[in-house]
């Protein structure tokens, strides 16, 4: 009798506590870049769909942009195939990454209109009207099993191609305004999807995401970032959880959100990264069938082979260069005839594995259609450019340069540069080549903006992809590529 009474008392005490919390889930991806398919048993939309089918709790699926380009399927369809895949997954919303503008203004609207989910970009307005076009929204309210989610979106402020159609507003000011509008609707959970990162060390611009969010003292509960291809989990700053999910659909973040069952308001959130191993997730058949139907023909053509793996990352601790980026720079300099070729490391997306090299492998490695531009610069400009690109992270690889430096407290010291074996002369003029994107001042190539467009000339008609194809076909098998061009003392 006493035991029965004790259990009854405990039940009365515990049962109300159990009612205090309600759990919903956010799944997050970013920077998928058209990687629809599993590779070596990992990743792809069918694997993600398989995982979602296993979820027992109510969830919302969100994305932080850069879905439009990065593989041949995405590129050839100008992003529309990516949107079709996301439609099939049931994405609730995404935002605009910088690569959503790879196909310039004419490519943006058809791609976004194909989406069955809202594209949230509060900082993008029509340049003529000052208002958002109908295919963009600032935020969206979602009901997730009775929990009122407000999702705000901010697009990337620096598109890969300058836009004449849109005026891009300052994100921090826009966020202040939209957050006030959202709060007036009394949501339970506020989420920001932003194509920006709290740990971007590769694009040569300081991230403002952390500062503009934390000043709101936790009013934004969860921030879902991207752009830097980083994995960030459970980073809490001033009451806000920051999450980033990597790239290429290799992983997904699962954020568990607890809300008070009585008030409905946000209580807490925690995140975990889930690798999309197909043995664990399975591949959901309808999504796999759609992906296969969208596959571009002819991409399995073998171009040649590699006798060793060519890594895009440095292979020795005191070196800032890598075998694959050096190879890209070398074949492009040979084509251009320049003294120096500058290759932006961010343009190399994946390694070239040992074995056969197909057209798909090459496009996945370097998915851009850029050609080569050539310009004459002073040694002084070249020295400043190299120094800027070394810290906090090495942004570029070079053919024709040897670089040595010390890094002290994040600053470059004792920099030494040799151009084709000769010490750099600040007063000498050098012929420098790079891809057209960097030459035009895109992203980390911004120092080239100070050089007049009339002084830049295109070299030949081949794209860098075509140049690499020819190099593989004529020199296969690719062997080991020397490193040690950038030495950290």
Region roles according to the model:
Residues 8-16:
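Bacterial N-terminal signal peptides
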Residues 1-8:
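Bacterial N-terminal signal peptides that target proteins for export
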């Amino acid at each position: 009798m006493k035991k029965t009474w004790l259990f009854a008392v405990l039940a009365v005490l515990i049962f109300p506590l159990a009612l205090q919390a309600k759990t919903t889930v956010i799944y997050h991806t970013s920077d998928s870049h058209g990687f629809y398919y599993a590779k070596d048993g990992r990743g792809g939309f069918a694997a993600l769909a398989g995982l979602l089918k296993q979820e027992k709790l109510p969830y919302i699926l969100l994305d932080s942009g850069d879905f439009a380009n990065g593989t041949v399927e995405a590129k050839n369809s100008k992003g529309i195939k990516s949107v079709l895949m996301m439609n099939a997954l049931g994405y609730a919303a995404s935002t605009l990454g910088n690569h959503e503008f790879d196909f310039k203004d004419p490519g943006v609207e058809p791609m976004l209109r194909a989406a069955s989910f809202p594209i949230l970009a509060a900082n993008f307005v029509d340049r003529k009207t000052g208002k958002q076009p109908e295919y963009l929204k600032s935020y969206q309210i979602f009901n997730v099993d009775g929990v009122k989610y407000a999702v705000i979106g901010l697009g990337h402020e620096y598109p890969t191609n300058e836009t004449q159609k849109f005026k891009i507003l300052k994100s921090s000011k826009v966020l202040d305004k939209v957050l006030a509008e959202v709060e007036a609707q009394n949501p339970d959970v506020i989420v920001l999807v932003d194509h920006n990162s709290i740990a971007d060390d590769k694009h040569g611009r300081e991230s403002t995401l952390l500062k503009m969010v934390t000043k709101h003292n936790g009013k934004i509960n969860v921030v879902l970032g991207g752009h830097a291809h980083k994995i960030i989990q459970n980073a809490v700053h001033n009451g806000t959880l920051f999450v980033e999910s990597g790239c290429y659909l290799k992983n997904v973040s699962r954020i568990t959100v607890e809300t008070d069952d009585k008030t409905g308001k946000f209580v807490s959130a925690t995140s975990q990264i889930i690798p999309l191993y197909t043995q664990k997730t399975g591949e959901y058949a309808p999504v796999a069938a759609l992906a296969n139907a969208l596959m571009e023909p002819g991409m399995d053509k073998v171009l040649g082979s590699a006798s060793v793996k060519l890594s895009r990352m440095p292979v020795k601790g005191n070196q800032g260069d890598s075998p694959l980026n050096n190879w890209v720079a070398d074949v492009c300099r040979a084509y251009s005839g320049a003294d120096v070729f500058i290759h932006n490391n961010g343009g190399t997306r994946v390694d070239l594995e040992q074995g056969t090299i197909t057209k798909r492998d090459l496009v996945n490695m370097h998915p851009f259609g850029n050609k080569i531009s050539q310009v004459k610069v002073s040694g002084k400009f070249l020295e400043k450019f190299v120094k800027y690109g070394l810290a906090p992270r090495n942004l570029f690889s070079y053919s024709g340069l040897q670089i040595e430096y010390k890094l002290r407290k994040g600053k470059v010291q004792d920099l030494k540069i040799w151009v084709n074996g000769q010490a750099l002369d600040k007063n000498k003029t050098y012929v420098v080549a790079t891809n057209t994107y960097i030459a035009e001042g895109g992203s980390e190539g911004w120092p080239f903006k100070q050089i007049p467009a009339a002084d830049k000339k295109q070299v030949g008609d081949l794209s860098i992809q075509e140049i690499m194809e020819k190099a593989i076909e004529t020199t296969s098998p690719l062997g080991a590529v020397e490193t040690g061009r950038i030495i950290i003392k």
